[in-house]
């Protein structure tokens, strides 16, 4: 396991090199990310799996979340996808994951009330890309998550935490555990990010290659 800690720019560079130069498709990386989060949830929180809610944004972090929901569903977990944001803005990878989830008839909703019955929440709204204050439906979702008292597993970064500074961008998810991909992130080690991340699990077997 590496102790390397990276910025958002470095992580984007590594992802881009892996996808565009080496040729590993982004969907492969997304599946590996989802497997890592699924494994952490199943192994670390087996008593919290009665009603899992995956809160998915419209970008690739949300695509990770939808893949996580599918993998939990296939493991026999009752899971609901809570969609946040505009589906018209969904990334291509997100759209692919959504199509697969529909095949498996995984329940989906946009009603925040579903969080009231959750026994575990997966935060998959924002990954490493946030650079402005969280507002609107995303802020409402974050505040609703924080008003629960259940286990929260953040995907890559707690939504609302700046990847480079660890600062809260208006509002941010308070996670029980953050599963971050390939390398630890600077924002998880400083300022509010240290507290909001909870326990940090670095999923370093991602197939992402660092070339500086």
From Swiss-Prot:
Its cofactor is K(+). Binds 1 potassium ion per subunit. Coiled coil: none annotated. K(+) binds at residues 61, 123, 159. InterPro entries: YjeF_N_dom (IPR004443), YjeF_N_dom_sf (IPR036652), YJEFN_prot_NAXE-like (IPR032976). GO terms for molecular function: metal ion binding; NAD(P)HX epimerase activity; nucleotide binding. It comes from the Bacteria. Its EC number is 5.1.99.6. Residues 11-212 form the YjeF N-terminal domain. It is an enzyme of class 5 (isomerase). The keyword NAD applies. It catalyses: (6R)-NADHX = (6S)-NADHX; (6R)-NADPHX = (6S)-NADPHX. (6S)-NADPHX binds at residues 60-64, 127-133, 138, 156. Gene3D superfamilies: YjeF N-terminal domain. Catalyzes the epimerization of the S- and R-forms of NAD(P)HX, a damaged form of NAD(P)H that is a result of enzymatic or heat-dependent hydration. This is a prerequisite for the S-specific NAD(P)H-hydrate dehydratase to allow the repair of both epimers of NAD(P)HX. PANTHER family: NAD(P)H-HYDRATE EPIMERASE. Belongs to the NnrE/AIBP family. This is NAD(P)H-hydrate epimerase. It comes from Limosilactobacillus reuteri (strain ATCC 55730 / SD2112) (Lactobacillus reuteri).
